[in-house]
Structure formats: C-alpha cells, structure tokens
Amino acid sequence: MICGTDEAGRGPIAGPVVAAAVILDPDNPIEGLNDSKKLSEKKREKLSLEIKEKALYWAIAQSDPDEIEAINILWASMKAMQRAVEALPVKPDMVLVDGNRVPELKVPAKAIVGGDASEQCIAAASILAKVERDRQMLKWHELYPQYEFDKHKAYGTPKHLELLEKHGPCPIHRKGFNPVKRLLANL
C-alpha cells in the first residue's frame, strides 16, 4: 500500500500547519485529483468528500502555532506529516511525500518535488490538508473576526497586514514570522 502525504499552511502568518496522509483504492479511482493550489475552493470541497468516501484510509494531523514557533515551520510541517501517517490504522509499505525532504517515519519514504501534481495519493493528501486548514481558519474567524481570516485564510495579504497593524497579533499569529515579528519589534 502506497501512502501520499502533504501539508497545507506553511506560508500563512497565523494558524496551524495541517497535514494529511491518504492511501487510495486502486480499484476506485477519483477523477480530477491535482495539487490543491491548482483547484478552486468548490472543487477542493467536492474532492475532499470523495476522497474521504473512496480512499482506503486517510488521516489528518497538525502542528499548532506554538509548536511552529518552538521548532520552526519546516520541522512543524514534518511533524504534522509524521503524525498524519502514524494516525493511519494500517502501516503503509511506502510513503510518498511532496517536497524535497521526508519526515521521520517507521516505513520507507520518498520525497517527490512537485508530487502534489504528479502523484494521485499526494494530490489527495494535499486536498484534504488544504480543506481542513481552510475550515479551521473559518472557525478562527468566528473568534477573531477583526482579522478577516475567512477572506485570506491567514496568508500575508495587504489587507491582512493592514488589519494586523491595526489590531496587533492575536494568539494564533506566528510571532516568529516576519510581518508579525516586525510589528512586535515596533510596539
């Protein structure tokens, strides 16, 4: 069994990094899988439901902003992917990882640059991770509406930076990330 894993949320300046691990059913293909960044939100939502229904196994895990601050975004991403793979109810024979590094795993793993566009199982993981992270950011928006997380999902857009400057950071902002770090240095 081949597992694909990927993360979503390395670039934003707030919120968790979320990872998913997916083992697809070769006898039950899913049409339209691709890198989550190349799909519309509506398409990702639709595919996310189909992946959860048709995949043999899937799991989602994350690293929260405090962990990101403690160990940096790269290692937090690796930890989230490791947790997602370990949360599967079975041990895969091989794990394909999007990117150029592999997390510490108890099974063989291979890094594939651009794997979210070339490997169906990684694309599926990419979609699950992105949809879950976006949902979490909508929940954070309910708690902190002044940052408009519902619009930019915590990426450093001009509007988000403007709101960050106006209101200061909230508890889920990544204080070690440059726009937030600069703001805190000037307080």
Curated annotation (Swiss-Prot):
Free-text cofactor note: Manganese or magnesium. Binds 1 divalent metal ion per monomer in the absence of substrate. May bind a second metal ion after substrate binding.
Residue span, RNase H type-2 domain: 1-187
Catalytic reaction(s) noted: Endonucleolytic cleavage to 5'-phosphomonoester
GO CC term (a single one): cytoplasm
Subcellular location field: Cytoplasm
Biological process terms in GO annotation: DNA replication, removal of RNA primer; mismatch repair
Family per record: Belongs to the RNase HII family.
Protein name: Ribonuclease HII
Source organism of the structure: Idiomarina loihiensis (strain ATCC BAA-735 / DSM 15497 / L2-TR)
Upper classification of the organism: Bacteria, Pseudomonadati, Pseudomonadota, Gammaproteobacteria, Alteromonadales
